[in-house]
Amino acid sequence: MISLFWADALVKDLSGPQRVSTGISPSGPIHVGNMREILTGDILFKAITKRGLESDFIYLCDDMDPLRKVYPFLSKDYERYVGQPLKNIPAPQGAGKYSDYYLEPFVRVMKEANIPARVIKTSDLYESGMLAQACDIAINNREKIKDILETVSGRKIEGDFYPYEPLCEKCGRISTTHVISYSYPYAEYACKCGHHGFADIRKAEGKMPWRVEWPAKWFALKVTVEPFGKDHGAPGGSYDTGRRIAREVFGIEPPVPLMYERIILKGKGAMHSSTGLAIAASEIMEVIPPDLLRYMIARVNPGRHIDFDPGMGILALSDELEKLQDAYFENRASLDEDQAAMVEYSLVNKDRKPYPVDFRHLVTLVQIYRTEDEILRAVKKGQPSDFIEADFRKEIEYARRWLERYAPESVKFRILPVDQKIELSDSDLAILSDFLNGIEDMPWNSESIHDRIYEISQKFKTNPESVFTLFYRVFIGKDRGPRLGYFLFNLGKDFVRERIRNVIRDH
């Protein structure tokens, strides 16, 4: 049976060597929404590789793009840099360049998430001369390109059009220059600052405008597959103009396209670096395991938007993934091909299940125990021989940080002191006494505790939920809490016994 998983379906008819390309303009923090592009590309790359085809995966950093405005997260001092390439602008903090400041944390995220893309800076493509031929072809076909842009986009281009934007050697801007004449390899230009000069297209002394540069990269880098956002794929958008320029100017077929929808931040809208409405990818990778981030992207067809809830949504997502992972490693035949593919493309390490303890339960443990060593002692028994302590300590940190930054109050709790007094009814006391009377003979594990709670609810002809609420009130002073069987098991029989005895004694 052939998998209907979206990535496998897209690449099933490909043949010969393939190159998957993705990219971004590092104009601000590279956020979770941007992860959809590179992870979609990575999943396609892995699907191609799985088919046995020779494949390569690149990630283009458009560091030659100009700073378009002073974004909300920048100081007003950046007004002086508007129009200059991102690679030439100082970083918002510390030494270094603006583009590297936002790119480098994302490169670390790529490594953690097992994304083997080669990062290529657009400035290096220009400086090395790799785009020189494409620049020359584009400039020599400027009237044809102008006609395509006007016809497809529906927008009139005024004045003498050249598909090249020189970098002014005086003011350092790209956005304020225009080409006067061209004789290979030099573009003569004038700038609004009053400077007149020449730019060498064999170097990073200018760039093509985006709608021309994109197909030029397909040509120069031999790109065969590329995912892109819906803004580029809109009617009359840059993919529509790009595929015509690819065919009619560069004489190539455009890459196999895959348009993806946005990631929507719950209650706020689509993420954008320029508006400040975003969670940085490096930030989210501090609070959730990489497999979970990969699964969030893999599970949803790219044509549908993703609702991202960094609060309770993370717990629901982790429950879903862990259930599938259990089946994948223990009884793969129980999964359909689509489900198996989702898990396969989510795993950072395909040889073993990544979570020795599920994320939801780990969130409970970090609130019960004070140290990592205590948590390790609590879970180490019964773990497989390939249990890796260092990896599990990472998981503990994910849970701690998620709890601090994104967990809703309903998930947080504090264990009440063993002698804390609370108000209880006679029926509450009877239920607690019954539980206490049987505690010594009861096997102390989560399943037995869970079953015992249900037995008591039947014996006292009361709703099980009310019994659960009673125990939560006794131990954390709230009406709801973590899964009770696991919770009481990890508190330990001695503490549970002593706490219930004290509560009963106070009445």
UniProtKB/Swiss-Prot annotation:
It comes from the Archaea. It comes from Thermoplasma acidophilum (strain ATCC 25905 / DSM 1728 / JCM 9062 / NBRC 15155 / AMRC-C165). This is Lysine--tRNA ligase. PANTHER family: LYSINE--TRNA LIGASE (PTHR37940:SF1). Belongs to the class-I aminoacyl-tRNA synthetase family. A motif ('KMSKS' region) lies at residues 270-274. PROSITE patterns: AA_TRNA_LIGASE_I. It catalyses: tRNA(Lys) + L-lysine + ATP = L-lysyl-tRNA(Lys) + AMP + diphosphate.
